């Protein structure tokens, strides 16, 4: 897995939630661009658990990365979703999108990230969306990202480059990438992925299951290679 492609003459902004995927992307960006050329942008969209924002803030402070927090909580007033409703039960009905899907969220995040990036003279926008393990989320697909990239370039007459380093990686391969970057233990300990907002994860929600299954698979594969 090619993770080091020095690009220290450019700057990049990472859409950062404090979860496993965006934290892995943040570390890869630091390796590629240099810490001094990286910024993080985090969105307060009305998520049901404050721990997400707390983890994101703690990680960027620990790493010495500039973070910009954008309030997009108006989303909570115009769409209903289990990730923004503390009383909602997380579920997925057959042949339907899971109720954790937030309509328009990634489109909005990319739009705001692009507006901010252009103001800072930054062209590269990094996001941790992934098509391989995606839970049916249409805005995690490569075709959406490519379309959004073209749209933003046309809308602002600016050459953005939306990068998705995890797009075709399984969750096990994402853990492998973190390990190759030397931060597997850090990602495992400091990131938050749980839909239920439980420190260390509930182990039962779809996000925890995917995360834990991927880690177990990677560690098993790694153990076999080391035998």
From Swiss-Prot:
Mind listing the UniProt keywords for this protein, alphabetically? ATP-binding, Ligase, Metal-binding, Nucleotide-binding, Queuosine biosynthesis, Zinc
At the top level, the lineage of the source is Bacteria
Q: Which reaction does it catalyse?
A: 7-carboxy-7-deazaguanine + NH4(+) + ATP = 7-cyano-7-deazaguanine + ADP + phosphate + H2O + H(+)
Q: How is the cofactor bound?
A: Binds 1 zinc ion per subunit.
**Protein residues bound to Zn(2+):** 194, 202, 205, 208
Please name the GO terms of the biological process aspect recorded for this protein, alphabetically: queuosine biosynthetic process
Name of the protein described by the UniProt record? 7-cyano-7-deazaguanine synthase
